[in-house]
């Protein structure tokens, strides 16, 4: 494949990636957006593998077949509830790939041969230009390894927290911000040392060790309530790691794709931080500004219990119902009976809508994906800002598997770890039914005063079983 054809294929692939992002921004066009991405990636892979500078094509194809087989097997096996962990571990692969590309490219920059017939001044200029190009390559290698290493360990920690293998609480080391700053300063000094003596790989090895520890500490010091932001932030890091690898490999498409992923992930992180009343810088810095007194996780009064039959009677007599799902709905796989209840109530003329918090679940858009999977109509699925003013005029709210995102302590308790975080104001409705397995605290480790309010009733048990019981009673 000629160089010109490869560049044309890269331009087409880049356009398809942009169309993919645009398509994924809306429910109606999400499937088309997914296909745009698949076609774009296929074109990019073919152009790269069979390009004029490609070597070892046979081994690359063998590696792709093995990797693809593992990927398909894992994707078919993984549950929708485990999607956040899968995304996190995939981000770690991008970071590790950037580290390996950086080390593989170390010392591979070859200076061009000096043309004959140059005078002394031209020769000096040529030598200076080659020195600059060598330094640029070494900077690309150094930064590519640094970003990749941070992404790798950060993503591994995120995977551990999301899968429950690592405690979700924030790691609060003494002087943690000074440690982060020291890691950055020492890494910068090591880059200067490396540029002054590129023959020595010791500064790169030392920086890699620091970057691995830095990435681990960044994510470990972020609490469970902020994990959805962490996933989108690591998505951004993986994009910049890919872009850095693109600079090292002199691959324009990898640079463009990495920049698209990096910028979109950063924008999504910023939007989610605003939705959680968190500073974007605080999340990047790893829990900066999160030093609040932990509010009591003790029970704060008597709670009332109810039954599926009583909830069914409430729903029969209601004219408006809002359902606020959370991660518990995903774990119980309750989205299908919830969709059935929605359809049955709408047949009776009840106005049923869904209120989705921006950080509900463990992944941006987690609840939207589950509801779309269960064929819930898009027009009844509303964001927090669109529905929060309607709770006061609502007869019944069903809180299915949500906890921290409906916690009034965020507005009422200034000492709460989630103080200031915008939440779904479900307690303003006439009746609130909370589906929970037990009275345990949520992912942020904070007790929820909602459970003890006069208009709240608790429906204990597996969310899917309880929703199916209500469906039978209807």
UniProtKB/Swiss-Prot annotation:
Question: Among its keywords, does the record have DNA-binding?
Answer: no
Catalytic reaction annotation = NAD(+) + NADPH + H(+)(in) = NADH + NADP(+) + H(+)(out)
Q: Which parts pass through the membrane?
A: 4-24, 46-66, 83-103, 132-152, 181-200, 202-222, 229-249, 253-273, 321-341
The UniProt entry's GO CC annotations, sorted and at most eight, read: plasma membrane
Bilayer disposition of the protein: Multi-pass membrane protein
State which Enzyme Commission number(s) the record gives: 7.1.1.1
Q: What are the GO MF terms of this UniProt record?
A: NADP binding; proton-translocating NAD(P)+ transhydrogenase activity
According to its UniProt record, this protein's enzyme class is: translocase
Fill in the subunit field for this protein.
Heterodimer of an alpha and a beta chain.
Q: Which family does it belong to?
A: Belongs to the PNT beta subunit family.
**PANTHER family linked to this entry:** NAD(P) TRANSHYDROGENASE SUBUNIT BETA
Q: What name appears for this protein in its UniProt entry?
A: NAD(P) transhydrogenase subunit beta
Q: Which organism is it from?
A: Haemophilus influenzae (strain ATCC 51907 / DSM 11121 / KW20 / Rd)
Give the source lineage, highest ranks first: Bacteria, Pseudomonadati, Pseudomonadota, Gammaproteobacteria, Pasteurellales
């Amino acid at each position: 494949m000629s160089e010109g054809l490869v560049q044309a294929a890269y331009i087409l692939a880049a356009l398809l990636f942009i169309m993919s992002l645009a398509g994924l921004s809306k429910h109606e066009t999400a499937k088309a957006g997914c296909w745009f991405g698949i076609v774009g990636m296929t074109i990019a892979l073919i152009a790269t593998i069979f390009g004029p500078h490609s070597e070892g094509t046979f081994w690359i194809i063998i590696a792709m077949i093995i990797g693809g087989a593992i990927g398909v097997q894992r994707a078919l096996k993984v549950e929708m509830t485990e999607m956040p962990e899968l995304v996190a571990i995939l981000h770690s692969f991008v970071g590790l790939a950037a580290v390996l590309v950086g080390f593989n490219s170390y010392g591979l920059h070859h200076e061009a041969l000096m043309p004959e017939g140059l005078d002394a001044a031209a020769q000096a200029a040529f030598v200076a230009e080659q020195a600059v190009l060598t330094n640029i390559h070494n900077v690309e290698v150094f930064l590519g390894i640094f970003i990749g290493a941070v992404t790798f360990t950060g993503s591994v920690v995120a995977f551990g927290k999301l899968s429950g293998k690592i405690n979700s609480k924030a790691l609060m080391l003494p002087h943690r911000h000074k440690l982060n700053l020291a890691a950055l300063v020492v890494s910068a000094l090591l880059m200067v040392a490396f540029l002054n003596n590129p023959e020595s790989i010791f500064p790169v090895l030392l920086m890699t060790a620091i970057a691995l520890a830095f990435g681990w500490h960044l994510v470990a010091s972020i609490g469970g309530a902020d994990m959805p932001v962490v996933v989108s932030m690591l998505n951004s890091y993986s994009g910049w790691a890919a872009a850095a690898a693109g600079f090292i490999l002199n691959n324009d498409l990898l640079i463009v794709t990495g920049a698209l992923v990096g910028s979109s992930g950063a924008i999504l992180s910023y939007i989610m931080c605003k939705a959680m009343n968190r500073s974007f810088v605080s999340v990047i810095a790893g829990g900066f500004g999160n030093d609040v007194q932990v509010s009591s996780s003790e029970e704060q009064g008597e709670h009332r219990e109810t039954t599926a039959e009583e909830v069914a009677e409430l729903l029969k007599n209601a004219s408006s119902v809002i359902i606020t799902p959370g991660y518990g709905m995903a774990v119980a796989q309750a989205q299908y009976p919830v969709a059935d209840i929605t359809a049955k109530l709408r047949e009776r003329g009840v106005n049923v809508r869904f209120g989705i918090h921006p950080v509900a679940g463990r992944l941006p858009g987690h609840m939207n994906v589950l509801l779309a999977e269960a064929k819930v109509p898009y027009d009844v699925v509303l964001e927090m800002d669109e529905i929060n003013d309607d709770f006061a005029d609502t007869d019944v709210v069903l809180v299915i598997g949500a906890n921290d995102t409906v916690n009034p302590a965020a507005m009422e308790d200034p000492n709460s770890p989630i103080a200031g975080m915008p939440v779904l104001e479900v307690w303003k409705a006439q009746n609130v039914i909370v589906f929970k397995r037990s009275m345990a605290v949520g992912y942020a480790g904070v007790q929820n005063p909602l459970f003890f309010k006069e208009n709240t009733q608790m429906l204990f048990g597996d969310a899917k079983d309880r929703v199916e019981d209500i469906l039978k009673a209807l």
